[in-house]
Amino acid sequence: MSSPTPPGGQRTLQKRKQGSSQKVAASAPKKNTNSNNSILKIYSDEATGLRVDPLVVLFLAVGFIFSVVALHVISKVAGKLF
């Protein structure tokens, strides 16, 4: 009676080598021929909509957060005084 092959061994090594060689071939850079990529269109001049600098968006977001915190502090102080 032959015993079943143990896990691992020569076949597993062959599969690993084949898998790694296929991954190298699959990871080769592919040229993108689609000129209407939506992710690239966001940063191009062809994008429609409002164009705002990212730094402006950052300052507006921080200003909004600051105003919300200030309103909370004002309401707490006003609640204790009146």
Swiss-Prot record:
Major subcellular site: endoplasmic reticulum
Biased composition (Polar residues): 19-36
Stored PANTHER family: SEC61 SUBUNIT BETA
GO CC terms in record: cytosol; endoplasmic reticulum; endoplasmic reticulum membrane; membrane; rough endoplasmic reticulum membrane; Sec61 translocon complex; translocon complex
Membrane-topology annotation of the record: Single-pass membrane protein
Matching InterPro entries: Sec61-beta/Sbh, SecG/Sec61-beta/Sbh
Compartmental location: Endoplasmic reticulum membrane
Cytoplasmic side: 1-53
Keywords in alphabetical order: Endoplasmic reticulum, Membrane, Protein transport, Translocation, Transmembrane, Transmembrane helix, Transport
Function statement: Part of the Sec61 complex, which is the major component of a channel-forming translocon complex that mediates protein translocation across the endoplasmic reticulum (ER). The functional states of the translocon complex include co- and post-translational ER import, cotranslational membrane protein integration and retrograde transport of misfolded proteins out of the ER. In the cotranslational pathway, ribosomes synthesizing presecretory proteins are targeted to the translocon by the cytosolic signal recognition particle (SRP) and its ER-localized receptor.
Domain of life: Eukaryota
GO molecular function, one term: guanyl-nucleotide exchange factor activity
Transmembrane segments: 54-74
Protein name, as recorded: Protein transport protein SBH1
Originating gene: SBH1
Organism listed in the record: Saccharomyces cerevisiae (strain ATCC 204508 / S288c)
Region (Disordered), start-end ranges: 1-36
Subunit structure: Component of the heterotrimeric Sec61 complex, which is composed of SSH1, SBH1 and SSS1. Presumably three to four Sec61 heterotrimers assemble into an oligomeric ring with a central aqueous pore. In cotranslational ER import, the pore diameter varies from 9-15 A in a ribosome-free resting state to 40-60 A in a functional state when associated with the ribosome. The Sec61 complex is part of a channel-forming translocon complex whose composition seem to change dependent upon different functional states.
Biological processes per GO annotation: post-translational protein targeting to membrane, translocation; SRP-dependent cotranslational protein targeting to membrane, translocation
Family of the protein in this entry: Belongs to the SEC61-beta family.
One Pfam family, short name: Sec61_beta
